[in-house]
Structures are given as C-alpha cells and as structure tokens.
Amino acid sequence: MNQNTSTRRHFLQSTGALVATTAITPYYFSAERTLAQESKSANDRPHIGQIGCGGQGNGITNAARQFGDVVAVCDVDREHAERAKARQGRGKAETFDDYRKLLDRKDIDVVTIGTPDHWHTKIAIEAMRAGKDIYCEKPLTLTIDEGKLICRVAKETKRVFQVGTQQRSDGPFARAVALCREGRLGKITRIVAAIGGGDRGGPFKKQEPPPHLNWERWLGQTPLVEYIPQRCHAQFRWWFEYSGGKMTDWGAHHVDIAHWAVGADNTSPVSFEGTAEFPVPFSNGYPTVDNAYNTATRFEIKTKFADGVELVITDAMGKHFETNIPETTLDRGNGLLIYGEKSDLFVNRDRRRLAGKAVEEERDNPLPEGAIARLRKGARRGHMEDFFDCVKTRREPVSDVFSHHRAITTCHLANICIRLGRAIKWDPEKEQIVGDEEANRWQKREQRKGYEITV
C-alpha cells in the first residue's frame, strides 16, 4: 500500500479524539454514529449500492454502512467484488460486474462511487438519472467538460451529491477558512498549496490480464491498451489516461480549501503559468512512452484570481516561500500556507495542525458564534453523516458538486498548463480557455466507443 492511500484511508476511518490545537472534535467521520443511532428502525435505513470495491471504495462504504444497509456491490475485478460482498454486505449483498445492473435496482437509494477517476462522471450521471443520491470519491472528473456535464445533470435531477473532499468536514480546515473569511489575517494576498509530488515507475512489462479482472471494461472511455498491473487499482493515478496525478489527487483537497478560504466556490483563477518535471519525455503535451508512469513528479504553478489573489500549487514549498510562521511548525511537503496582510496561517492534515498569529489571538478573541456552522451550511459534524443527513432533509451537502467542479477545474487547468509548457488564460464565466485553440481542445477527451458519457 502506498503512503498516500494509507494516510487517506486512516483519515476516512478515524473516529478520533479531541484535537489538542483546536479543542474541537474533528468533523470528518468522528461523530458518525449520532445520526445512525437516530434510525432505530431497519425500515428507516437507506439501501446502499457500492460501485468500486477496491481499498478506497471499501473505505467510504465502511463509513456509509453506519447509516444504511449495503444490498449490492459492483466491481470489474471479481475478487474485489467478492471481498466487498463478505465485508460490506455480510455475504448477502448481490454482486455485479456491470454498474448499470446495480442502478436498475429500484430499491437502492444511495450509491457510493469509489472507482478509478476516469469512471466517476459516467457512473455519477447515470446514477442521478436513475434517481440515486450519491457519495463519490474525489476527484470527480477527468476533464473540465465532464464537470460541466455533471453539474448540469445535478441541477436537473436535484439529487443529493456529496464529493469526498472531506477536509471541509475537518475542524482545523473549517476553522482556518473561518479565520480567513472573518478577516483575521487581513486581506488574503497569496495561498500556497503543497500537495506532494507524483511517483516514478517503469518501464513496466505488459502481461495478460488476470482472469478475475475484466480489463476491457476497466479501461472504460480510455484507449484500449495492453494490460500492465501498474496501470490499474491504486496505481492508476500516476497515468494521465485515467487521472491527473497528484495535481488532481491531492489538489482536490488543498485547492478546494484554498477556493473556500477566499470565497471562490463559484469561480476559478484567470491565469496559469508554471513549470514541471515528468518521469517520461513529452511531445505536444503527450507522453512518448506507454509503459511507465507519466504524471508530473515536481511542479510549481502560479495562478491568479480576478481580484489579484495568487494561488500557487506546488509539490513542496521551497524556502523562497518566506513566512513568519516558525519552521518547526511548518510542513513544507504538504499543507496550505495562507498569506494575509496582517499575518500568515498554516494548516494541514498531519496531526490536524493549525498555526499562526490569528490562531493564537483567537484564544482571547473567539470567532463569532456560529461562524463555522454558517460556513458549513449547517452540516453535520461527520462528512458521511452530513451526506446521509442531506439524504434525509434534501439540503445541499458541505462538499457539493458545484464548488468541487470549480476547484478541480483549477487543477485540470494547471495540468494543461504544464503539459503544454505554456501560460494559459481562463474565462471563469464562459468556462473556456482564452486565445489558445489547442489548449481549449484539452477541456475534453475523445471517448472510446461504447463508453461515451451522455446526458
């Protein structure tokens, strides 16, 4: 198991203690049983269908089954599906290798989607059309135009849709955003999001797919290629064909918080420029090697919002990012460093760390009552608990599909910028790259026949 997957799964499954630096119980999944205990009757519990039964798919469904009953599981890897049937459905869940058959079941109320990234949008759109509420793993989309489609269908169907950007349900991150929104740092001038670099690997040997894996179906909308074990399951994120590398994997988290901090849930930066290193050679934006990881390993992209706020997305904060926060408190490899005219603030997931002058001053000058609750739209404390409360009440979840689309668009644009090796301009109103026809074509991808995304 790679460190990224292990850390994330621990974050999802934690039922943790109080956070010493904040004296607040973490929001994410710590208090999940509260709502679950309210549903005393088995008839009150929603029926859940699990689509994607790998490590992360099981992680989110583990949390979901506190509030509902898993009645069906689906995966194109038969071994994954059988393990999920035993684990999630106590051996009673119906097993599928085609998600469409699961969606045909009228008794399923909720689906969890924990597939590789290139399947998220197609499954989510068809699930909404089938009348299901959705909890989908991040990043929600493979391209910018996929995000436009998924937002369109979400508006039309009015289904409850929670994205797995659970840092919005984590106390220190919500508190950091509240401090920014309440002006405790002064005017925000710059945010640096350090998200870690991608993996290197390859060349890998092409093989026959194992008999328990439907490789052709796993590939979905992407080109039909020979099987390499390192292309699929947890390693899919290091291939641009199926994901966006660390830019979308961890950018989905930290860039989302950056957007939230500056009130940019309905927009994206207007300019992008930067540099990157890749593990294989590129030509015209495409990798020239087909048997090795190809997403960026090191990068620094400077973006700017229309109001002048700068957002830097980097694999690690170099020393050129100076701050008044002590080095002993910083983690330059992962976290958000937020610069304000009055002071700086740092927050990350490691030990739920939150530091800066504004944090210290809050002890004598607390945030206004309800500041965090208003920011979180009245959400329940746990991320999954919030989702199931929204299923019950029909309100909008804290990590809604529309704000996520804007944040992940920023990540997609950063990847387009470094793959083409040039600066790009973005019109957030028209949702279109400006003055660059070639770059504009990268807002979508050709989809393999039989696996097209239709609305």
Question: Which positions does each model-derived feature cover?
Answer:
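N-terminal Rossmann-like NAD(P) cofactor-binding module of classical short-chain dehydrogenase/reductase
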Residues: V111-T112
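Beta-strand-loop-alpha-helix segment that lines the small-molecule cofactor/substrate pocket
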Residues: P116-D117, T121-S169, G183
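C-terminal helical cap and adjacent loop that interface with cofactors, partners, or active-site loops
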Residues: S14-A20, Y27, L35, G59, ...
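N-terminal Rossmann-like dinucleotide-binding module
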Residues: L18-G89, Q167-D170, A258
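N-terminal secretory signal peptides and thylakoid transit peptides that target proteins
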Residues: M1-V19
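Basic phosphate/pyrophosphate-binding loop/patch that engages nucleotide-derived ligands
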Residues: R152-K158, R175-T189, G197, Q207-P209
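Rossmann-like dinucleotide-binding domain that binds NAD(P)(H)
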Residues: E216-G308
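NAD(P)-dependent dehydrogenases' Rossmann-like dinucleotide-binding region
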Residues: G52, R184-G202, N214-I228, P269-V280, ...
